[in-house]
Amino acid sequence: MKLLRQFAPAATCAALLAASFSSAQNFSEIKPSPQQVAWQDLEFGVILHFSTNTFLDREWGDGSADPKVFNPTQFDPDQWMQAIQASGAKYVVLVAKHHDGFCLWPTGQTDYSIKKSPWKDGKGDIVGDVARSARKYGLKFGVYLSPWDRHDPRYQDPVAYDKYYLSELEELASHYGDLVEFWLDGAGSGGHVYDFKKIIETLRTYQPNTLVFADTGLFEYGDARWVGTESGRVPYENWNVIDRHGYLRWRPVEADTPLRDLHWFWHPNDDKSLKSLDELLTTYDQTVGHGAQLMLGVAPDNRGLIPDSDATRLKEFGEAIRARYAHNLALEHIATSAEQAAALDGDPDTFWSAPNGSHHATLEVNFPRPITFNRALTMEWLNDGQHVQKYAVEIWDVQASKWKKIAEAQAIGHKKIDTFTPVTASRVRLNIESSSSEAHIREFQLYLIHGAETTAP
């Protein structure tokens, strides 16, 4: 699922942004759309890979597979969604067509689809079934439609293929309800030129609010960008605004990684590649905890079910995340003002604001007795832009009679989780050392998480 080679790496974009701080006023003026704000609040989604590859022990289909191999005799989208819901994910993106060109809906554009499979005598619709089941379980639904098509001969003619691809997109965008996200993956496309402007125009005709995932090569059209690696980690300070050819735009990061190491599709006898719970928790800390969206790859097997081991791991993952963040110690603070309480109430719909026009501020939290904690979770209110450029979490050192830093970084963004060795204090503060405009803090939370002192740097 690597993106087009002409797309600029995300790390490069971060560097470009850092270089643009000399124009901090422009940076602070860039704001997200309401759709981007709502999407970032989802935080965690799942992308589903299921196609002829599933039945042939393949990762990269070449378009030669006979549709007759596709026959998931125990297909149960409700079982998929139950497992995904248990993980804590909020949305699902289905790979409706991967690079092999096989379509999971009864498209009118090609016979290379489930219409020619034995499943349901060619009368089934995986996309429709998955969309309905996702919404049944409270999950938002989106689709991935690969531009690269290794089966259809029209791919050799850019004009003919654009017409074909746009017709497929029109079917998906007009028949399956609201789409939370549309994934553009350019893997394998090489020098092929697509009419991306028309692709986005077609999508927007039917889905004006869909979040388009792409990368900076589609800067004019994409709403979110690739992290630059399939590790599911954000290895850099995460800024939502990036500079592309002198233009600043709000482009939050989505970080994709498969549940089974290196495999997006299911393969038999491959349970050993299932990621451990600890690895998934570290991934969460370094994606969601670094202000990015986590997109976890889940692969149904050739029965049409999420494998039991994968479903169990997803459930464990969801339970562990919920347990970790069940006891917010900041709720035990001594109340001082309604303004301060807005960042300490556990309600992300309220926020504390630094003094108007300020570039430095502190949010101090006092407790009736010392608390011990090893994790701080901070969220910016981003509707007016990402303003914090440098911050620190500090405790009052009674013996030294001064504030002591226990964590520091630059970006906060949607959510920043800082971890450190356990400390004990009755006074804690968030020190906004530099901001392009007054800081807005949705949440400042503190936790003691056993066995998690080193999961995120």
Residue ranges and their predicted role:
Residues 1-11:
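Bacterial N-terminal signal peptides that target proteins for export
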Residues 9-19:
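Bacterial N-terminal signal peptides
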